[in-house]
Regions:
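Bacterial N-terminal signal peptides that target proteins for export
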Residues: 4-18
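Bacterial N-terminal signal peptides
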Residues: 17-28
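Extended ligand-binding groove/face enriched in aromatic
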Residues: 58-250, 262-266, 279-307, 351-406, ...
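Extended amphipathic alpha-helical interaction segments
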Residues: 205, 272-274
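Terminal, non-catalytic domain-edge segments
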Residues: 33-53, 118, 157-164, 178-181, ...
């Protein structure tokens, strides 16, 4: 539930738009020339060496976290992890699995299929009995994981989702969706029946957790409620935070189009309809991050007030257009213009938002007043979050401002509205019928500006990894925070005093980065596949 970072954005894989364009792109670049044999051999050798390091030296029972020090003495997912832990949340274990399948598609080398199989073993072990996944799993067992939550997790001031162990699974941050999509892709590769039970459990988890109106909670199944600072437990609320509904619809569409499971059509359509019923009425036709069970906007974490969220509204408008292109039903377009008008009307005056940002993140229900988030104190024990109308000194780790491209939203709507339903649904798996369309060839490829195949080959070190900036560090756990506020100012920082285990930016720390691995492998895959645009 963190604010979208570049790592997290890039870890988000195929969206509904990709499903719609997969057929159109399937022949793209078919006339491109393959690289010379010698160059191709160099690329493939580099890929193999890097992946061998990953599978033989870095993986723990097939799973991965996000970042490692070169000597493996410390490692991190969204928080510092232990040696026996693997991270499910992207760009973690399942994301690496997607990359291995992509490499298999590019090279035909069964080594990468076997690497993907190792990842699947870790994910199947980590799968909750109900069928979903938590952010993290620990091969040392649940007792060890609970102890981690009660120490490292509990003291991450800004990471409230890690301060308590619920013992269930989460849709947050696409961990469940990423894992489920990977198992689907791996099963479809050779139809190996050993993956089908876990895949079926994941599908059933998405179906079982869906509310009758079509929305999904953040966590499932429901367990004993946990209160943070006196607030109700938000994890059962229907949520749009971090694209939960969009990810689940995407997964179900992928299953519908490949497995021939006709029963999935109804939950897909109900999931889409949930966007209609949760859109607020005039004069504030936007969406909240989450809702009560009677569909009223509600607070979640202590820095997510009851409000309408501008970035969520913009994302949901994009999805409404995609739903029209999937179904041809104009009801999904009916209220798009008024929501765009509303977003335009609440743009901040010049000079209020930082450069590149246009809107406040949170808008007060009933007033259109921007709500700006602040904090005081120095750790999870003595600190608190609050909001007011002051745009100065807002949080560093969760921006009070968002970039909303009104012009792009209007064009997206206009282009869709100009299409007839028949034109809009060309290539839609919901129109073509279940079990008809293939999935895209690649899922995990990331952009890598300025990186070439030659530079990627040259920069792989003798150990077999790309040394890269890790981007952040954290205080090792030393004990619970004090009730006394430490000297200093922590209102705009990513981390509090030395008891705060939340990661913080660090431009000096280098090591082994999953993101760097995926970016470099993406460059190399593009170099050997002539169907990829250059």
């Amino acid at each position: 539930m963190k604010e979208e970072t570049m790592i997290h954005q890039n870890a988000r894989r195929i969206r509904l738009a990709a499903v719609l364009t997969a057929l159109a792109l399937s022949g793209a670049g078919a006339m491109a020339q393959a690289p010379p044999r010698e160059a191709r051999d160099d690329v493939m050798a580099t890929m193999k060496r890097a992946a061998t390091f990953m599978t033989e030296k870095l993986a723990y029972k097939g799973g991965y976290v996000w970042n490692y020090l070169p000597d493996l003495s410390r490692r991190w997912g969204e928080m510092e992890a232990r040696e026996t832990m693997i991270w499910i949340q992207p760009p973690g274990t399942a994301t690496v699995g997607h990359l291995y399948l992509d490499a298999y598609h590019a090279t035909g080398d069964n080594f990468y299929y076997q690497a993907a199989d190792q990842v699947a073993g870790a994910l199947i072990w980590a799968q909750h009995p109900a069928g979903g996944w938590n952010y993290v799993a620990d091969f040392a067992g649940e007792r060890s994981l609970k102890e981690w939550y009660e120490t490292v997790g509990k003291n991450g001031w800004r990471l409230e989702e890690f301060q308590h162990y619920w013992g269930n699974a989460t849709f947050d941050d696409a961990g469940t969706a990423e894992s489920a999509k990977f198992l689907l892709r791996l099963y479809l590769e050779k139809r190996d029946p050993k993956y089908r039970p876990s895949l079926d459990k994941a599908i059933q988890f998405v179906l079982d957790s869906q509310y009758p109106i079509g929305a999904w909670p953040q966590r499932y199944p429901r367990v004993a409620e946990h209160s943070t600072r006196g607030l109700p437990d938000y994890t059962a609320y229907p949520t749009f935070n971090d694209d939960v509904a969009g990810e689940n619809i995407d997964f179900l569409v992928m299953c519908y189009q490949t497995l021939g499971d006709a029963r999935l059509l109804d939950p897909i359509l109900r999931g889409m309809n949930a966007f209609i019923v949760t859109q607020q009425g005039p004069p504030q036709p936007g969406w909240s991050l989450q809702y009560t069970l009677d569909l009223k906007p509600v607070q979640a974490r202590t820095y997510e007030p009851r409000s309408l969220a501008t970035h969520t509204t913009a994302r949901n408008l994009e999805l409404m257009v995609q739903f029209y292109r999937l179904t041809g039903d104009t009801k999904f377009l009916a209220r798009v213009p008024e929501a765009i008008d509303w977003l335009e009307s609440i743009a901040l005056p010049p000079g209020v938002a930082p450069a590149g940002r246009t809107h406040a993140t949170f808008i007060e229900v009933g007033t259109n007043r921007p709500l700006y988030i602040h904090r005081e104190g120095s750790n999870v024990v003595n600190g608190r979050y609050y909001w007011d109308s002051n745009p100065k000194d807002t949080l560093g780790h969760y921006s009070s401002f968002r970039p909303i491209n009104i012009v792009a939203l209007r064009k997206l709507y206009a282009d869709a509205r100009a299409m007839t339903p028949e034109q809009a649904t060309k290539g839609s798996p919901l129109v073509a019928g279940h079990g008809v369309l293939p999935l895209p060839k690649y899922f995990a490829l990331m952009p890598a500006p300025g990186v070439t195949a030659a530079s990627s080959i040259a920069s792989l070190n003798k150990e077999g990894y790309w040394l890269a900036p890790l981007g952040y560090n954290s205080h090792p756990y030393k004990g619970d925070g004090s009730t006394n506020v430490a000297p200093g100012s922590y209102g705009t920082t990513h981390v509090g005093d030395e008891s705060d285990t939340s990661p913080y930016p660090d431009k000096t720390l280098t090591g082994i980065s999953i993101e760097a691995f995926i970016r470099n492998m993406s460059v190399l895959i593009r170099a050997i596949d002539p169907s990829m645009s250059k």
